[in-house]
Amino acid sequence: MSALTSNFAPHIQAMPGWRTSLGHSPRDMKSAMTSFDRFCSSHHPGETVLTRQLATAWCQDTATGTWSAHRSRAVRELGKYLQLIGAEGFIVPSAWIARPTRGLPHMFTDEELAAFFQATDSIGADYRSPFREYTIPVIFRLILGAGLRPPEARRLRRHDVDADNAMVAIERSKRNKDRRVPVSGDLAGLLARFDHLADLRRPGREWFFEAQPGRQYSPAWLIASYHRCCELAGGIAPASTPYTLRHNYATRTLMRWAEEGKDLGAWLPYLAAYMGHQKYSPAAWYVHLLPERLAATGLTSVAGIIPAVTS
């Protein structure tokens, strides 16, 4: 965390350790807390107590007059931490924080996916992004083929990928949970060939996808590469993100199971575990993306085929 200068700096620096112990990423509040520190230093340099007035002043975006849910979630966590250690601190009520609305992700057609991966395979070499001509086709196939979160794919270390046994180890992902993800034989073969080429280029590298010695690719690089491929594919899915590939893995898996006549209610927990969901409901949400396709199979007439999503 960059240099902090407000009176809250010691607490802001200590809070990530507490959140990590609860299974949260130490990075998830970093940007917001750094911004809060600057706000306090600039506008409330003498303040030593997280009061209701201070918390609401920061949560209110003065430029737009709107209430920031992102800021309120962060300062709520700071208030909880302060009270936990016996300090005075206002906890922003959860009722003040609007729940984010979840838009429907783009569902790629087979033709769009073929065009997308044709675009990934057409990316040429560039001295500014060494090895991208191999990394881009493989990392996006991995996200789609194994349903990984984009950060999970970026952060893979070389020892996490066991191509011989077609297994990928995801370490300390969301809420610091670990899991092992089986992959198809074709995908395992692709990962093995990529690893061999990358090892010839940079023996003993740390990251499976390594941008520079000892450095993984950045989120911005992955997003920019994804959008470039969408554009090269004819401008498909302009509002989508790399996460859209993960969503498509889930929906295509569900469709395959439905067409095979499997009981989705019984199989959804397996999908949830495979994709690293702590709860059942996120996986069940994917069922609601497929009403027309499921109806076409005739399976929606079976009682209980679409479980209720309560959260």
Residue ranges and their predicted role:
Residues 1-311:
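Conserved catalytic core of the tyrosine transesterase superfamily
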